[in-house]
């Protein structure tokens, strides 16, 4: 959520930033109008309360002097009713303002390129060279079924489209990837490992910006009023919701693996085969809490943490900065890492790393103190995929496939695969 002072002091800037996303900036005028009404109501209410205090003194004085106080008592009752009415009006305006503010996205950083869609994202780095095959490479969805690593048909029977059973060495590879990523982030990148709740309440979803605007993208357990998480970013960021982080704690760096659940509303017809776009998938997440002046350097570091995984696995990738028309709701700036997939003859997103500045912290009331005597300030929150496990799985299977149908295990993963260096079709 944005600071109301930005609307008061820099309305033109806020309007232009909203328009860069392709959104309607008239909400700024709506907020300013409501804010003016609110301030007038507060002023009027304070005047009434001051008069009520004065009348209370007059009543007491008249009673001490044994004078008739009926007139001032009547005024006191009228003032009480008027104050109650003003408070009700103020509460209504507050609810209207919050209802609008909570749907306004974060302000985009000045260095984010302008554009309308992912086609306008700007490549800033490329690593590795896509492999040239001496044979016709297969798509990962064909490879995993031939090697008995996955079963899409039985998953469809059990759960519907966009689900998968990972079987045999497919399940082992998925587990190995999660263990490898978590180990890398905790032992080399300084993150604290967390196991997170995968069902959360509405306040938690509100804190990170999924609610109320993106409810259609979520799965909800209606009876309990809980939501399945679309990413571990949600519970990790809300760890400090409604708390003041004590001096000396920041920077705080969490990592955790979880299943992620997404309805993929609006994705009909896209990536219908394989592991790229599922309703349920595994992901390793990185979340950071930073002092405001440190968050931009933290974004660069977090992105290189994700890149280190891809490089150690030997997977060609590129880094792009998302344009104004493609960046997420809560982010001020986002880097996407895109891995090379031979089946697409293109790069596909495998990680997003974002600086959300104080946007989520204001929604979730996450504050910190620089020292014991200091006034609490809003922290900056960052999140990044480190990485999307299923897409990493697909990238390994496609980029490390062999002509005989086997798949070579990247060297970095061998210890996590029990020493196994190759995946072959099971004998049975």
Swiss-Prot record:
The keyword ATP-binding applies. GO terms for cellular component: cytoplasm. InterPro entries: aa-tRNA-synt_IIb, aa-tRNA-synth_II, aa-tRNA-synth_II/BPL/LPL, Ser-tRNA-ligase_type_1, Ser-tRNA-synth_1_N, SerRS_1_N_sf, SerRS_core, tRNA-bd_arm. It is found in: Cytoplasm. Its main location: cytoplasm. Its EC number is 6.1.1.11. ATP binds at residues 262-264, 349-352. The lineage of its organism: Bacteria, Bacillati, Bacillota, Bacilli, Bacillales. Keywords: Aminoacyl-tRNA synthetase, ATP-binding, Cytoplasm, Ligase, Nucleotide-binding, Protein biosynthesis. Pathway: Aminoacyl-tRNA biosynthesis; selenocysteinyl-tRNA(Sec) biosynthesis; L-seryl-tRNA(Sec) from L-serine and tRNA(Sec): step 1/1. CDD domains: SerRS_core. Consists of two distinct domains, a catalytic core and a N-terminal extension that is involved in tRNA binding. Catalyzes the attachment of serine to tRNA(Ser). Is also able to aminoacylate tRNA(Sec) with serine, to form the misacylated tRNA L-seryl-tRNA(Sec), which will be further converted into selenocysteinyl-tRNA(Sec). It comes from Staphylococcus aureus (strain MSSA476). Homodimer. The tRNA molecule binds across the dimer. GO terms for molecular function: ATP binding; catalytic activity, acting on a protein; serine-tRNA ligase activity; transferase activity. It is an enzyme of class 6 (ligase). L-serine binds at residues 231-233, 285, 385. This is Serine--tRNA ligase. It catalyses: tRNA(Ser) + L-serine + ATP = L-seryl-tRNA(Ser) + AMP + diphosphate + H(+); tRNA(Sec) + L-serine + ATP = L-seryl-tRNA(Sec) + AMP + diphosphate + H(+). Belongs to the class-II aminoacyl-tRNA synthetase family. Type-1 seryl-tRNA synthetase subfamily. It holds the Pfam family Seryl_tRNA_N. GO terms for biological process: selenocysteine biosynthetic process; seryl-tRNA aminoacylation.
């Amino acid at each position: 959520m944005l600071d109301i002072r930005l609307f008061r002091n820099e309305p033109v800037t806020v309007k232009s930033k909203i328009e860069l996303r392709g959104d309607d900036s008239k909400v700024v005028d709506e907020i300013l109008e409501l804010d003016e009404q609110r301030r007038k109501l507060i002023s009027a209410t304070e005047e009434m309360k001051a008069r009520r205090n004065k009348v209370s003194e007059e009543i007491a004085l008249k009673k001490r002097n044994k004078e008739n106080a009926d007139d001032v008592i009547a005024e006191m009752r009228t003032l009480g009713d008027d104050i109650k009415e003003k408070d009700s009006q103020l509460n209504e305006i507050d609810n209207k303002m919050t209802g609008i503010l909570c749907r306004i996205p974060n302000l985009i950083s000045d260095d984010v390129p302008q554009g309308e869609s992912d086609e306008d994202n700007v490549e800033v780095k490329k690593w590795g060279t896509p492999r040239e095959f001496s044979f016709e490479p297969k798509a990962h969805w064909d490879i995993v079924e031939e090697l008995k690593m996955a079963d899409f048909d039985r998953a469809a029977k059990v759960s519907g489209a966009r689900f998968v059973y990972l079987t045999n060495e497919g399940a082992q590879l998925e587990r190995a990837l999660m263990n490898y990523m978590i180990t890398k982030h905790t032992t080399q990148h300084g993150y604290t490992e967390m196991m997170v709740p995968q069902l959360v309440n509405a306040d938690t979803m509100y804190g990170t910006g999924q609610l109320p605007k993106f409810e259609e993208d979520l799965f909800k357990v209606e009876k309990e009023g809980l939501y399945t998480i679309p990413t571990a970013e949600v519970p990790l960021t809300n760890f400090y919701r409604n708390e003041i982080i004590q001096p000396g704690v920041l920077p705080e760096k969490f990592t955790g693996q979880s299943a992620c659940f997404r309805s993929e509303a609006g994705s009909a017809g896209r990536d219908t085969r394989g592991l790229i776009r599922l309703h349920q998938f595994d992901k390793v997440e990185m979340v950071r809490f930073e002092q405001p002046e440190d968050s931009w350097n933290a974004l660069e570091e977090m992105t290189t943490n994700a890149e280190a995984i891809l490089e150690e696995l030997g997977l060609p990738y590129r880094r792009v900065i998302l344009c104004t028309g493609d960046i997420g709701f809560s982010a001020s700036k986002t880097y996407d890492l895109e891995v090379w997939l031979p089946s697409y003859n293109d790069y596909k997103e495998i990680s997003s790393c974002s600086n959300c500045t104080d946007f989520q912290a204001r929604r979730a009331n996450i504050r910190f103190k620089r020292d014991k005597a200091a006034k609490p300030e809003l922290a900056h929150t960052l999140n990044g995929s480190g990485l999307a496990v299923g897409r990493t799985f697909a990238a390994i299977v496609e980029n490390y496939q062999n002509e005989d149908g086997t798949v070579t295990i990247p060297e970095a993963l061998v210890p996590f695969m029990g020493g196994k260096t190759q995946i072959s079709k099971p004998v049975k």
